A protein has these predicted regions:
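FAD-binding core of flavoproteins
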Residues: 1-84, 88-92, 205, 215-222
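Alpha-helical interface subdomain recognition
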Residues: 62, 71-222
Length: 222
C-alpha cells in the first residue's frame, strides 16, 4: 500500500501519551515556538481522522500523504512571499541608512558609474525583482486553481535564497549598524534563513523542478 496508507489525524493538546519534549532554541523566528513532540501509547479517537479511512491508490485522491504534499502548492508561494517581504523591508531600510551616510543610489544610471555600495545595492534590488515576479505568478496560479507545482517550487527556491542573500547583503552594506541590534537588519537576516529551508530546501525544490521539466517520476529521478 505504501504512501496510500498514510493518514492524518488531529491530536489535541493534553491527550494522554502526547508529551512536549522540549522547545527548540533557534537562530531566528524566535516568537514562533518550535517543539519536539513524542507519542507514547497515545490513543487517538477514530473521529479525529482527517479524510476517509479507506486506502485510495487512485491518482489525485488528495488523501493522506498525497494530500499533505498537495498543500505545498499553496504554502510554498506563501513562504516565498514572506521571503520577498523580509527582503523588501531590509532593502528599504538599507537604502535609508545608505542615503543618511551620503551614498547616492540612482536607479536610472548604469551601475558602473556609481559607488561600489550603490552598485551592490542595485544588484540586490535586481535579485529581489526576479523573486517577486516568480512569487506573484505562483500565487496567481494558486488563486485561480491552476496547476502550479513547478511555479510554486521555482518561487520558493528563488525567493528563499534571495531573501537570505539580500538580508545578509544589507547587513554587510550597513556595516556595524547592520550587524548590531540598533536596527532590525540583523533580525531580518536571522529570520529569513528559515524561509530558505522549511516547506522544502533548495535541493528538494531543484529536484521537484527537474522532475517536472524532464517528465520523470520520483522513482526515476532521486
Amino acid at each position: 500500500m505504501g504512501r496510500a496508507a498514510i493518514k492524518s489525524f488531529v491530536v489535541q493538546k493534553g491527550t494522554p501519551g502526547m508529551n512536549v519534549e522540549r522547545l527548540e532554541h533557534k537562530l531566528g523566528i524566535r516568537s514562533s515556538d518550535t517543539a519536539a513532540i513524542r507519542f507514547d501509547d497515545c490513543r487517538v479517537p477514530a473521529e479525529n481522522l482527517l479524510g476517509s479511512p479507506d486506502v485510495d491508490t487512485a491518482p489525485g485522491s488528495g488523501q493522506g500523504f498525497a494530500g499533505a504534499m498537495a498543500t505545498f502548492d499553496n504554502t510554498r508561494p506563501l513562504v516565498a512571499a514572506m521571503a520577498v517581504g523580509c527582503a523588501r523591508a531590509s532593502l528599504d531600510l538599507t537604502r535609508e541608512l545608505l542615503e543618511q551616510a551620503g551614498v547616492e543610489i540612482d536607479y536610472d544610471a548604469p551601475t558602473y558609474g556609481q559607488s561600489a555600495a550603490a552598485a551592490r545595492f542595485l544588484q540586490l534590488e535586481s535579485d529581489w525583482e526576479g523573486a517577486y515576479l516568480l512569487t506573484l505568478e505562483s500565487a496567481w496560479m494558486a488563486d485561480n486553481r491552476e496547476p502550479n507545482s513547478t511555479q510554486a517550487s521555482m518561487a520558493k527556491a528563488k525567493a528563499g535564497r534571495v531573501g537570505s542573500d539580500v538580508t545578509l547583503g544589507c547587513v554587510e552594506l550597513c556595516g556595524s549598524v547592520g550587524y548590531s541590534e540598533h536596527d532590525l537588519l540583523e533580525k531580518w537576516a536571522r529570520d529569513s534563513k528559515i524561509l530558505d529551508i522549511f516547506e522544502g530546501t533548495q535541493q528538494i525544490q531543484q529536484l521537484i523542478i527537474a522532475r517536472r521539466i524532464l517528465g520523470l517520476s520520483s522513482t526515476e529521478l532521486k
